[in-house]
Amino acid sequence: RIDASVTPARLETAVIAAAINLNNELSEWRATQRAAGYTTLAEVPGDRIKDVSVKVHLYRRAIEAGTGAEVCERYRDYSATNTGSEKAEALTPNIDDYRRDLRWAVRDFLGISRTTVELI
């Protein structure tokens, strides 16, 4: 959860960073869709929920999760007091949860399994 101590400017920076990272990760997929004649994500055929493309929902989810992780990571770096250190330690599971949610949203978006398994 992002509290009021995060300024709008910091939040905007985190959203932009999340969007840049996500767009870079989806660049090949986007190129394929553009080659097929789709100019926006909403135009790409697929299932819909509440009249919005599932891909749009997943993209938004990935941006939200990436933003949350970015803000939590930066927020814990700003505090140097003992209380701040305790807050920073408490944020670590949230960061991991945000990163997991980001991975899942991207994998669902791309239609690949959420689980990576390697044989040893």
Regions found by a protein language model. Give the residues of each.
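Conserved short "hinge" loops at termini or chain/domain junctions
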Residues: 1-41, 107, 111-120
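Amphipathic alpha-helical interaction surfaces
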Residues: 21-28, 48, 69-77
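Short, exposed interaction segments that mediate macromolecular assembly or regulatory contacts
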Residues: 38-59
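Short loop/turn elements at secondary-structure junctions
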Residues: 55-120
